[in-house]
């Protein structure tokens, strides 16, 4: 009579292995910047809501990166404005922002995400400020714009979106670029300076994307983060132009795809220069070497 043998261990399902404690902790460690920023946004929002409308208005006024504050040396607003929201609806858009930032941090690590967000938030703010100064001095805009409210995360978030360009598969990249540029430009027509800042932040991100690491292989998790993050970015960019934005995006994609194909064909044709000599015939150097002395 054979002794009892315990049944062989059955391997755990793949899903269970993927969500094991070690794997979850490893992924969480790679999202420290995203998690810390989200918690700070929540903490600031909860605190300002508890303090009341007057306290929120005072903080928003102090942290606004408008011409008045920048001209008076309030350079701390360039950083502080990224943690303050003009409204109390942070709970509605924070999940989308977290997905967008998480995807960026998974691809570029924490340092890359910080650099990208800072380039968009500070870079677009400074460029917009220079443009506003010129517009006010030439009389194109009233002087009251110098005290306009300008806080929030949108410039940095849009720059992160643009910086994903190099990670988009090559065959889809022209449509990606045309779609987002079309939306941003359409929303900027007859809009305030914030919409123009979004265009600048998007262009800064796209330019920066080719100096950042690109994703080696897309997974289901990456795709899910992109879908949610892109939906959030769409609502940020479309702003007060919900009808013009999709038309602009489709127009941009329709223009960008054939234009990119034409550029690639011309580049490929220019890189191949046909030789004037048939295969096997004498080259100029060979002919010269055979000439009499």
Description of each model-found segment:
Residues 143-163, 168, 193-201:
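Membrane-interface micro-motifs in multi-pass membrane enzymes
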Residues 49-110, 132:
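N-terminal TM1-TM2 helical hairpin plus the immediately adjacent luminal interfacial "cap"
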Residues 31-44, 175-181, 225-230:
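Alpha-helical transmembrane segments
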Residues 16-60:
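N-terminal signal-anchor transmembrane alpha helix
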Residues 113-144:
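Hydrophobic alpha-helical transmembrane segments of integral membrane proteins
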Residues 1-24, 187-293:
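C-terminal transmembrane module of polytopic alpha-helical membrane proteins
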Residues 106-112, 164-175, 210-221:
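Membrane-helix interface "capping/anchor" motifs
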Residues 77, 94-102, 157-163, 178-187, ...:
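Hydrophobic, membrane-inserted alpha-helices
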